[in-house]
Amino acid sequence: MNKVKKRILLVLLAILAVILVALLVFFGVYFTRIQTIGSMEQLTDYADGYNLYRMDVKYDYSLDDIIDYGIKDDQTMIDAILKESLPLLPVKIKAPSFGCTAFTLTDTDGGVHMGRNYDFRKDTSAMLVYCAPKDGYKSIAFAALDNVSANVPDENIKKKLASLTAPFICLDGMNEKGVSIAVLTLDSEPVHQNTGKPVISTTLAIRLVLDRAATTEEAVELLRSYDMFASSGRDYHFYITDASGDGRVIEYDINGEPRELIDTPSEAVTNFFIRHKDKVLPNQKNDIYGHGRERYDAVLKVFEDEKGNYTSDTVWNAMKSAAQDPDPDAITSNTQWSISYNNTDLSADIVIRRHWNDVTHCDLESKVTTPSK
């Protein structure tokens, strides 16, 4: 009988040891993720429930591990992101979509700004994401929380965990070198390059540039070293600017095969191929070449009207001129956020959902966010 009890005790101790090891492993993996969740803060309080939040990413992540996972489609992209941000947990997210306007302006004091409207017909809260990767540049960036079903991210543990994916689903941002990037949707067939290079998806390209590019030129060369997979069944292009004012549109040639990356200097961009702007008319869709010419023209008109006296107000006037009200039939309607990135002093001013008199200011170096109006 004593031998039986001894064996039972040994089995129980073995089970307890396994459980303890598992708990230690889980706690080791999730300690900094728990810290990240703890840093979450609500910055606005609107009656409609769609707000601006901030989060300081404390956990180490490996962008290379995500890319090395092998992205072939939306599902493998999502699986790769979840494996890195939420290991050991069964969480589901959906692939995001994006619309928008973006532009570069150098003010009369020499400050370089990127103005950015994020337009999408489905309402969303926004997460301001601070990242400081150990092998990359510090950055601020913005994620649409509706894409992870977490418009109120601190509501429950499921939404808090889903928000940990935010570094890899950002739609625009700026790093400590003064490089800003934004993604904008197009109307063409999604690019899916297959030339033998490692594959990145749309939002991973944004994280790649923010973490590793010190200039627009470096960003372009980085993107050239990867094959692009456009996620969510849509095509996209990128707008990149830097502290010198080098603003370029990054597009994958719609008339080429394989669709070669082409960078085109431009003051502004919306939802049409900038290199084919002669084929694009305002207030209509222009087949594969895109739409949104009227917003592009509106931004340039503000630039022309205020030429010689550019200030931060010019940035806001341009964004207001291109902002859009909700339209359930237009995917790139309904401006969700507007941001003036200052590539020179490394700060950003943010307005959520066209609340133009309610501006939140954030500073990249100090990670301080304050209401400025």
Show the residue positions of the predicted features.
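Long, charge-rich alpha-helical interaction segments
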Residues: I288-T314
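N-terminal hydrophobic targeting signals that begin at the initiator methionine
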Residues: M1-N2
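Extended amphipathic alpha-helical segments with heptad-repeat/coiled-coil character used for oligomerization
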Residues: G233-K279
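N-terminal mature-domain region immediately after signal-peptide cleavage
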Residues: K5-A214, M228, G308-K373
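A recognition module on extended beta-rich or small alphabeta surfaces enriched in W/G with H and D/E
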Residues: S139-A144, P167, F272-R293
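Structured segments of extracytoplasmic/periplasmic soluble domains
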Residues: L208-R212, L222-F229, D253, V302-D305
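Secretory/export targeting leaders with adjacent low-complexity proregions
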Residues: E218-R234, F238
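A short secondary-structure junction signal
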Residues: A126, H192-T195, R248-D253, L261-I262, ...
